[in-house]
Structures are given as C-alpha cells and as structure tokens.
Amino acid sequence: KRIAIIIPYFGQWPPWMELYLYSCSRNPTIDILFFTDCPSPGDTEHVKFHSTTFDEYCKRAASLLNVRFAPHRPYKLCDLRPFYGYLHRQELAGYDFWGFGDIDLVYGDLSGFVNDCALDRYDILSTHADRISGHFCLLRNNEANRNIGFRIKGWESLLENEANVGMDERPLSQVIVPE
C-alpha cells in the first residue's frame, strides 16, 4: 500500500529535523511530502520537498476551498489537515492512504501499527482509540475521505477564524465518531 503524509511547514527547521528525517527513512512504506519555504536538506527516497511560500500555500487553500484563509501564523495550517486530501488530490494520485502529522515525533518502526492487516481493515488509522490525533493520522485515499473536512459543522467560519481551533482533532473526530 502507498501512503503519503502531507506536512506544510514554514519558517526555520527545528533543531531536531535531522533526527526526524532519519526516523522517516526508517519507515520506507510511508512518503512524507513537505510544502515549505525552508531550504531543502535534499530529497530522499521517501521524503520530498515542494518549494512554496506561506502566503502562496494559504492563497491556494483559500482559492480551492472558496473561503477567506489568510492566517498570520503557520500554526493555523493545522486546521487545514482534514482538507489535505482535497487540497493535495493531485499530489496524492496513486496513493492508497494520505495523512497528516507533526515533525516533533521520532517514528519508531511503524510497521507494527501501519501494516497490510490494518490498512485492509480500516479506512482511518490514528494513535488514539477514541479520537483522531493531530500528530499522526492516516485516511484511505477515497472520495469520502478526501472530502471529509467539508462534513465538519461550520467549517468555513472555523477556517476563517484567525485562531487555531484544532479542526484536525475534536471537530474531525465528531464527524468520524459522532458523540
């Protein structure tokens, strides 16, 4: 199964970036697709860097989602996570799963958790049993999951709100497992 994790990241790489990239290299079944203005440390077989600015990325999201999305801080991009499948559908062509994650994780051997048995059985994998976790989540690359963000109640106003509202966690969890 082909898996891609989308990570927009702007500013400066954190001091632990080399360690993060090393941990990615130890999980060859997962591709990491960065959208960034940071200097590329160089593509590896499973980590790709797409050069863009924060403003360009926000304008692309605003245009595709038809909302006013012009945050002042990159952390607000976490609220776009439920829409990554839709926003990056071209880059995700050919992948079986897409997902999102944080770069302050050091991945161990994910094959115990992300394996053919789990990928065949589930449409969504996350690190918590009762909710979606923003630090690591995979969704089957199908039309329903590419459009899952549009099912979040009031998604337009949540995206247009300057503050980060955690759309990748509670609001997305409420769509998947209604309370």
Predicted segment positions?
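N-proximal low-complexity "stem/linker" segments adjacent to membrane-targeting elements
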Residues: K1-L19
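Short beta-strand/turn micro-motifs composed of small residues
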Residues: I7-Y9, F34-T36, G101
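Short, acidic, metal-binding catalytic loop of nucleotide-sugar glycosyltransferases
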Residues: L19-D31
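Active-site-proximal specificity loops/subdomain of glycosyltransferases
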Residues: D37-A93
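GT-A fold catalytic core of metal-dependent nucleotide-sugar glycosyltransferases
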Residues: L80-I124
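A short, conserved acidic/glycine-rich loop-to-beta-strand motif
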Residues: D120-F136
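Short glycine- and hydrophobic/aromatic-rich loop-to-beta-strand nucleating segment
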Residues: H135-E143
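Catalytic core and acceptor-binding pocket of nucleotide-sugar-dependent glycosyltransferases
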Residues: N145-E179
